[in-house]
Amino acid sequence: MSWQAYVDDQLVGTGHVIGAAIIGHDGNVWASKNLSLKAGEGAKIVNGFKDSASVLSGGIFVDGQKYLTIKADDKSIYGKKGAGGVVLVKTGQSVLIGHYNETIQPGQATTVVEKLADYLRENGY
């Protein structure tokens, strides 16, 4: 399956995220739909997994929007803005990003992104 197919079918296609992307550990976008990272955001996202204190204190930027970080560790970063938010999950080679709005429960978005990340980790990605 291509990276774009994972974004289209396993993330956005579930209806539990409205936008998604997969980026490499270098911050470059591998695939995306309804989500566009601005210059430098990918690298800052990847760095947030190494330096959780920076994203906990300064928030996380995705698609030009700042999100209040509500969880950050070396595997997951969750951000909130109003009733929407973002779920970022690191795998061995990539970072999955899911964006949800007020019509989607945060837990639904989190489950979809975390499950795909688990699958990719189990398969060496």
Curated annotation (Swiss-Prot):
Record keywords: Acetylation, Actin-binding, Cytoplasm, Cytoskeleton
Function text: Binds to actin and affects the structure of the cytoskeleton. At high concentrations, profilin prevents the polymerization of actin, whereas it enhances it at low concentrations. By binding to PIP2, it inhibits the formation of IP3 and DG.
GO molecular function, one term: actin monomer binding
Similarity annotation: Belongs to the profilin family.
Organism, as annotated: Physarum polycephalum (Slime mold)
InterPro entries reported for this sequence: PFN, PFN_euk, PFN_sf, Profilin_CS
Any GO CC annotation of this UniProt entry: cell cortex
Subunit structure comment from the entry: Occurs in many kinds of cells as a complex with monomeric actin in a 1:1 ratio.
Transmembrane segments: none
Record bears the keyword Oxidoreductase: no
Positions carrying N-acetylserine: 2
Pfam families on file: Profilin (PF00235)
CDD domains per record: PROF (cd00148)
Localization of this protein: Cytoplasm, Cytoskeleton
Protein name: Profilin-A
Source species, domain of life: Eukaryota
